[in-house]
Amino acid sequence: NDFYDPNFLVRGDEMYLIDWEYSGMSDYASDLGTFVCCSDYGYDEALRVYELYFGRSMAPEETRHCVAFTALASFYWFVWALYKEACGDPVGEWLYLWYRNTKAFGNKALELSASL
């Protein structure tokens, strides 16, 4: 649930996930959605990330699920950023990134839902 690049340490061919503050047993799309929403990936790049995770082409329902979860994760982090900003703790460019991803992936999730 906090699965994004600042929480990875990379040294050579080793990689460590740090910061377990928001860890939990949850839906696989939670980590994927957070990873994508905290990146500058567009929709097509996000689809590639999802497929790399699965190691195969995805079923339409799986795609919709991952895209919808990316929208939800983006919205969660956007609201968190608004709160932090209101408390005088600026989050910088993350605020706009999460806002933009909420809109983009939310609209795409609605399109995918209508087509299934």
Predicted features and spans:
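Active-site activation/catalytic loop segments of kinase-like enzymes and analogous catalytic loops
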Residues: 29-58, 71-89
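ATP-dependent phospho-/nucleotidyl transfer catalytic cores
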Residues: 65-68
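Short, surface-exposed acidic/glycine-rich loop or hinge patches that mediate macromolecular interfaces
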Residues: 23, 40, 100-102
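Active-site acidic catalytic loop and adjacent metal/ATP-binding pocket
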Residues: 1-30
